[in-house]
Amino acid sequence: MREEHLSLLVCSRCRGALRVSAVQERHSDRLIAGELACIKCDATYPIVGGVPRFVPRENYASGFGLEWTRHARTQYDNNSGIPASEQRFFGQTQWPRDLRGQLVLEVGSGSGRFTEQAAKTGATIVSFDYSYAVEANAASNGHRDNVLVVQADVFAMPFPTRSFDRIFCFGMLQHTPSPARAFAVLPIFLRPGGHLCVDIYKFTLWRTILQTKYWVRPLTRHMNPERLYSWVRRWVDFMWPLAGCIRRLPKGYALNWRLLVADYSFLGLKGDVLKEWAYLDTFDMLAPRFDRPATLRTVQKWASKSGLEDVSAEYTPHGVVLRARAGRGALLAD
């Protein structure tokens, strides 16, 4: 982390300001290893690998840490050969491509493929994840002067309230213990009139019944992540020839998903890249401790309860996408 980014952080316990209390390794203006301390209470937070850590490295989201460190660059556009991350980021947020002078918060960064897209706007990006996937993000984006990567908990975010011009949260809400509560804390960190964009898996009773991942998740979500990942690779390898045949059928890729083989051929992926995405997202289907989708109406209710304005919500291939702006609710809540 850059020392000048210290002002973007606060103590996650008491909200006090932080100071650098120890430095073990520094590269120019970047702190690689050291410690932050609260000036109000006795809390201290290690800096490991250039990332301030406000939660233990290992936690209920460790499966995501394994996933995104093993596949650190798999879904980056320059690796996949398709602009999937760019299109999703700007398509869902509908934000301008020039955000210089603005402060943007990314909630749930994973490996950082959307961090990269956000950073290209010129805004200052504060990106955090609950898992140690932050290490993959830091390796890919931590060198950027306008990026701060943090490991933190959405329910105890170490940032000043009402400080961000924009917040986005992709692919994360459904994997928290309470998506409604996680959503509710986001507007508190927006400046008046600030922009919010989130997505969450779509819930329908029929869709849930048909999605075979929910049949096996009661077993797989309790497995050791390393063991599950090994099983997933063997399963995808075993099924790959059959999946290739099924893929030739009309919408055969959808049947492959039901057979627990993530198939992104509809995006135009091929060969080794397609198979790498299959390893990644098959594991992603089965590993999360929590998988709690929501309906469009439910997400709209969350927004209304939070006092958000200019609310727009829609179903997309990625689930429910909501865009909104902070109103009086963001000013009053704290």
Language model feature labels by segment:
Residues 201-218, 271-289:
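Short, glycine-/aromatic-enriched active-site segment of Class I SAM-dependent methyltransferases
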Residues 1-158, 291-292, 298, 313-334:
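Conserved N-terminal segment of class I S-adenosyl-L-methionine
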Residues 171-172:
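Short catalytic micro-motifs in class I SAM-dependent methyltransferases
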Residues 226-288:
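SAM-dependent methyltransferase
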Residues 180-192:
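A short glycine-rich, Lys/Arg-flanked "PGG" loop and its adjoining helix->strand segment in the class I
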Residues 167-168:
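Hydrophobic beta-strand segment of the Class I
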Residues 195-237:
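Conserved class I S-adenosyl-L-methionine
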